[in-house]
């Protein structure tokens, strides 16, 4: 079960919360859900260079509270808060163009302290490098090393498509550390992304295991222990497994 279901949806109500938190009458629910989709699409497009990790939406009467988690919050805020004002005006215009009534929009920006431990940012980085035609094995090796330095307990990366321009599409994946998908208390961050290459579409999936959390408790911010300098050792190269034969 844990191998097939979405890792985030599997843990909703246990250790993870919904990305949109509000209640509405059945008649208004579709319109508000559409608004959430418009807000996320607009912010994702406008903040593509800010390292956007997550968008949380809350509603209170005629007010919308947005919490934006970004690796580069300065890009979102702008000089003197000009970026936030532009976002509010742009969101108001976008929502009104689709028939939504005017609402008060409040934006709170939170900095992502460990960008290399966020599955969304890792998947986006892999896709960007694939579009620049860099060898996928080199990309995956560098991403795994960065994630391990960020203090994650496990990471799994899966790439599918015409890898390195091959004639036949295939799926390859690699894993370092633990990824306990069946354990509900395991804090697993999952993300997928698409790379538009000259050879076609390549799909990227990333699982990041950040530790275990007891139900009802907040996830503590993990601190990366300071490591003493040591002699350089021979690093084991990640191994890849080809799933194309199994899936066929």
UniProtKB/Swiss-Prot annotation:
Q: Which residues form the KH type-2 domain?
A: 39-113
Which Gene Ontology molecular-function terms are recorded? mRNA binding; rRNA binding; structural constituent of ribosome
Q: Which Pfam families match?
A: KH_2, Ribosomal_S3_C
**Any signal peptide, and if so, which residues?**
none
- Coiled-coil annotation reads none
Q: Which organism is it from?
A: Synechococcus sp. (strain JA-3-3Ab) (Cyanobacteria bacterium Yellowstone A-Prime)
Q: Does the keyword Repeat apply?
A: no
Q: What protein name does the entry list?
A: Small ribosomal subunit protein uS3
Could you state one GO biological process linked to this protein?
A: translation
Read off the PROSITE patterns from this record: KH_TYPE_2, RIBOSOMAL_S3
Give me the stretches of Basic and acidic residues compositional bias: 238-248
The terms describing its cellular component in GO are: cytosolic small ribosomal subunit
Q: Which InterPro entries does this UniProt record tie to the protein?
A: KH_dom, KH_dom-like_a/b, KH_dom_type_2, KH_sf_prok-type, Ribosomal_S3_C_sf, Ribosomal_uS3_bac-typ, Ribosomal_uS3_C, Ribosomal_uS3_CS
Q: Which SMART domains did the record assign?
A: KH
Disordered: annotated span: 218-248
Keyword Ribosomal protein attached: yes
Q: Which UniProt keywords apply?
A: Ribonucleoprotein, Ribosomal protein, RNA-binding, rRNA-binding
- Tell me which family the UniProt entry assigns to this protein: Belongs to the universal ribosomal protein uS3 family.
Summary of subunit composition and partner proteins: Part of the 30S ribosomal subunit. Forms a tight complex with proteins S10 and S14.
Q: What does this protein do?
A: Binds the lower part of the 30S subunit head. Binds mRNA in the 70S ribosome, positioning it for translation.
């Amino acid at each position: 079960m844990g191998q097939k279901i979405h890792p985030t949806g599997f843990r909703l109500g246990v250790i993870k919360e919904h990305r949109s938190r509000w209640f509405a009458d059945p008649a208004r629910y579709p319109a508000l859900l559409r608004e959430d989709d418009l807000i996320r699409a607009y912010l994702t497009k406008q903040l593509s260079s800010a390292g956007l990790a997550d968008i949380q939406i809350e509603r209170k009467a005629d007010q919308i509270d947005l919490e934006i988690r970004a690796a580069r919050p300065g890009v979102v805020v702008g000089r003197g808060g000009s970026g936030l004002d532009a976002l509010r005006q742009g969101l108001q215009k976008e929502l009104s163009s689709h028939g939504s009534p005017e609402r008060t929009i409040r934006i709170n920006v939170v900095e992502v302290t460990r960008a290399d431990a966020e599955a969304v940012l890792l998947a986006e980085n892999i896709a960007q490098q694939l579009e620049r035609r860099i060898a996928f094995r080199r990309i995956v090796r560098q991403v795994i090393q960065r994630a391990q330095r960020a203090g994650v307990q496990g990471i799994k990366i899966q790439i599918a498509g015409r890898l390195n321009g091959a004639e036949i599409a295939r799926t390859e994946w690699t894993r370092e550390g633990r990824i306990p998908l069946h354990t509900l208390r395991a804090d697993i961050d999952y993300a997928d992304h698409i790379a538009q290459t000259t050879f076609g579409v390549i799909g990227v999936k990333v699982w990041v295991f950040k530790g275990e959390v007891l139900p009802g408790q907040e996830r503590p911010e993990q601190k990366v222990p300071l490591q003493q300098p040591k002699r350089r050792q021979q690093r084991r190269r990640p191994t890849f497994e080809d799933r194309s034969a199994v899936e066929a």
